Amino acid sequence: MSDHAYWQVDVFARQAFKGNPLAVIADADHLSDAMMAQIANWTNLSETTFLLRPTTPEASYRVRIFTPAHELPFAGHPTLGTASVWASLPGNSHNGTIIQECGVGLVRVKVEDELFSFAAPPRKKSGRLNDAEYTQALAALNLTSEMVLDAAWGDNGPGWQVLHLRDQTVLRGIKPDWQAIGEAKYGVVAACAEGSETQFELRAFAGGGQGYEDPVTGSLNASIAQWLIEREIAPSRYLASQGAALGRDGRIVVESEGNTIWIGGLVTPRITGTISI
């Protein structure tokens, strides 16, 4: 049995317990794939990450990201949470830039005061949903075509299909059909009312097992930001919200700089200690 430093951090939250929690385990190089999967299933958080030594000199660290059911090549809030933990460890330093090695390659993370932001990775699949995919998406989310302005692939690792909805009323009224969702992952976005603090609101629905709604989702915000900004629907900098349906209050800072879109948020440690493995 070995003891490892362990954290649970709150990502994208401005108030305690209003973001998306993440478990982070340090010095995980000797852990087997099966053990990582077992630990992630036990923590039962949306994701658990394992800090490893990098395999390339360009990287600050390597990370593996697990849900309770499987491993992900990339995810947004685990990227920010893991980068924050790495930056807090003795002996680690950065000049405002951290390089994460993960399943999609190298991901840049920039640090500005308390704000951690990752560079949105390229989408593996984009373009509008075909007729069959669109029909399935409507059925899965109990929507009608009149409620949807556009629908596309926004797959940057997790496999998101994204829908731009008519308004926040439609977004907040979604009651997903988990059986119809199956193994798919759907993200929805709607513009906020004029005068709101945030410009867009999102929700994320992931199938598999019993299905769940994710409180605040970095990868989804990244793919939706790319989609909205390239269509000139969103400005180059905006603030998004997510999690209201679950009693959360996530805030996501989106900023486009040249060809890079940054997805940022605050990261706050809530639990620190050791885990015996």
Regions found by a protein language model. Give the residues of each.
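Active-site proximal loop and beta-alpha junction motif in alpha/beta enzyme cores
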Residues: M1-F74, L80-I277
